[in-house]
């Protein structure tokens, strides 16, 4: 089983990774091409393109200028310990042991606007470039056109025949994967929370639930859909009535354990 998650806007650039091993991104030529495309942009250009404050735009312009194709432990950090946010709160990478991380390195992939596809321990440098950004480039008018089939081809390289691919990424990021070219069955879990008697997707909780499921798949070394359906962290449970073959639905009643 392989599974995908989104990156995050918020970055942790100071904490010490709990595992002192790393790998290198496989699409650095493409990353360099994107950096070269965006480097000439001024803070005002970036603020307009990404709808950022002047302060954030200035910070990210300096990041583009400082970005280097050669990634080392001096100028980079492993991705899984760098991204923050709701998904990564659920995943809680710092508490995964070495055996878990070894499994994650084989099974988990992080979609990225700049790096395309990252393994958990791939080194990365600080950046802000969301997949939905309309950045004109030599291959088109946005990042979806830039990446084309590059990401799906990389994913297919990792998949064994018949191996499940679980999509725990947001729509914005999974749109960068050409589903028609996938060589394996695709499973897209959905997480619903009860509010005022009705079950619905609540973004904050759904993001955290995706991270929780990624952690569950890692810790339990899940390989089948039946094993995935047993996910029961933080009060969620599989609901066969609302589920379909490719979209297992997990619900959490308001009476479930406290939501943190």
Swiss-Prot record:
Gene Ontology CC terms, in alphabetical order: cytosol
Pfam family membership, one: H2O2_YaaD
A biological process term (GO) from this entry: response to hydroperoxide
Recorded coiled-coil stretches: none
Source domain of life: Bacteria
InterPro entries linked: YaaA (IPR005583)
Family: Belongs to the UPF0246 family.
Entry-linked NCBIfam families: PRK02101.1-1 (NF002541), PRK02101.1-3 (NF002542), PRK02101.1-4 (NF002543)
Record-linked HAMAP family: UPF0246
The name this protein goes by in its record: UPF0246 protein Mmwyl1_3597
Organism, as annotated: Marinomonas sp. (strain MWYL1)
